[in-house]
């Protein structure tokens, strides 16, 4: 049986004082942006006890690892906490914050995950901070109410713009266009120019448009959690 990762923490005292954050990634091939994950993980681990989780507890498969960052990922994958927990076994009530980095694979698995939907429903009901970036925002589409309405209707958010998506060779076969889904579901969607830093904060929900929006989005998550203490 695969050993699940333990939350990232420092010493015992530090672990008790830090809030816990669930970091969810896609489990599909080339499912997680290396740049967004690295920035999310390093920044968030300074403020939270992090627990990484994926569907089935499958290993993260990173896309776009640069030569500069390759050593960091080699070291990361040797750590026990690099082994994700099973998303199916996660109890959302144990976590203070939820972070979903830019995950191109989210279109395939997270956007249809009933387990993530339950976690998001809990976080929304309790107004706990949620931060999603790039295609990680698409993962939010899994969360619907009993009447099939979207949990995030009436929220303002951002995510990959059509102008960013159209550059992808698989654009014509994408199962979901976030901008269309959000607008059709009653949310307010905004986007800046392609690759620009653009972050939207609405109540307890923080969304970033793309990879480049990762750091300011996570910084807002930390500030939001600090303000709730």
From Swiss-Prot:
CDD domains: GATase1_Hsp31_like
Presence of the UniProt keyword Signal in the record: yes
Primary localization: secreted
Intracellular or extracellular location(s): Secreted; Early endosome
Gene Ontology CC terms: cytoplasm; early endosome; extracellular region
GO MF annotations in UniProt: glyoxalase III activity
Entry keyword set: Endosome, Glycoprotein, Secreted, Signal
GO BP: any one term: methylglyoxal catabolic process to D-lactate via S-lactoyl-glutathione
Keyword set includes Glycoprotein: yes
Residues the record marks as carrying a glycan: 154, 212
Self-association and partners: Homotetramer. Component of the FERRY complex.
Function of the molecule: Component of the FERRY complex (Five-subunit Endosomal Rab5 and RNA/ribosome intermediary). The FERRY complex directly interacts with mRNAs and RAB5A, and functions as a RAB5A effector involved in the localization and the distribution of specific mRNAs most likely by mediating their endosomal transport. The complex recruits mRNAs and ribosomes to early endosomes through direct mRNA-interaction.
Entry protein name: Glutamine amidotransferase-like class 1 domain-containing protein 1
Organism name: Xenopus laevis (African clawed frog)
């Amino acid at each position: 049986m695969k050993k699940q990762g333990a939350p990232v923490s420092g010493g015992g005292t530090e672990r008790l004082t830090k809030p816990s954050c669930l970091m969810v990634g896609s489990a599909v091939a080339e499912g997680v942006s290396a740049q967004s994950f690295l920035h999310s993980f390093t920044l968030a681990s300074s403020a939270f006890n992090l627990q990484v989780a994926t569907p089935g507890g499958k290993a993260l498969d990173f896309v776009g690892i640069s030569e500069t960052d390759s050593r960091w990922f080699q070291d990361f994958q040797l750590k026990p906490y690099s082994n994700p927990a099973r998303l199916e076994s996660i109890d959302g009530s144990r976590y203070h914050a939820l972070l979903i980095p830019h995950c191109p694979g989210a279109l395939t698995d997270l956007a249809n995950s009933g387990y993530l939907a339950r976690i998001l429903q809990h976080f929304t009901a309790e107004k706990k901070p949620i931060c999603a970036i790039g295609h990680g925002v698409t993962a939010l589409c899994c969360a619907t109410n009993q009447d099939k309405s979207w949990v995030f209707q009436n929220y303002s958010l951002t995510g990959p713009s059509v102008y960013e998506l159209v550059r992808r060779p698989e654009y014509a076969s994408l199962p979901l266009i976030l901008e269309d889904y959000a607008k059709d579901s009653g949310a307010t969607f905004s986007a800046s120019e392609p690759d620009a830093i653009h972050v939207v904060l609405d109540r307890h929900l923080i969304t970033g448009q793309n990879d480049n929006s990762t750091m300011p989005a996570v910084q807002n998550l930390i500030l939001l959690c600090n303000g709730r203490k």
